[in-house]
């Protein structure tokens, strides 16, 4: 995996990755690959070597105004990054908590199961950090309403994430 720097994460320049993720024709396919790589420990090691990668993926996710495949892959990728504390801190700093809570508050009825599962897993993982809990405290009412909204889902992953968030 490290033998070929396919996405330029090991180089000082961000040009290659930035161009790939911002290319309207390629960005979905690039995000599918990144999402797959983020599923593996070595893949996360490789991808997170590029400090600006999380910023670019978050911006790509925010640009998408619908629950598209691209936004889903961005969300899934950053959720997988939150298995580590440094990306958790970065995502909290980028205000992803407010973004995902507002997304759920405004679009809950139209979101795919994928977005709901990965979004709630992201909320749970970010709530494990003290800084994350402080951000959630500022929007506690809205967060609780969202968690309540999804409690009737017949999906064990969703219920596990809700439970984990409430207990953190």
Give names to the regions the model predicted.
Residues 21-35, 65-83, 93, 99, ...:
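Alpha-helical solenoid repeats of the armadillo/HEAT superfamily
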Residues 1-27, 36-54, 84-95, 129-141:
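Elongated alpha-helical scaffolds that mediate protein-protein interactions in large eukaryotic proteins
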Residues 1-20, 54-64, 97-108, 144-155:
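Amphipathic alpha-helical segments within extended alpha-helical solenoids and repeat-rich scaffolds
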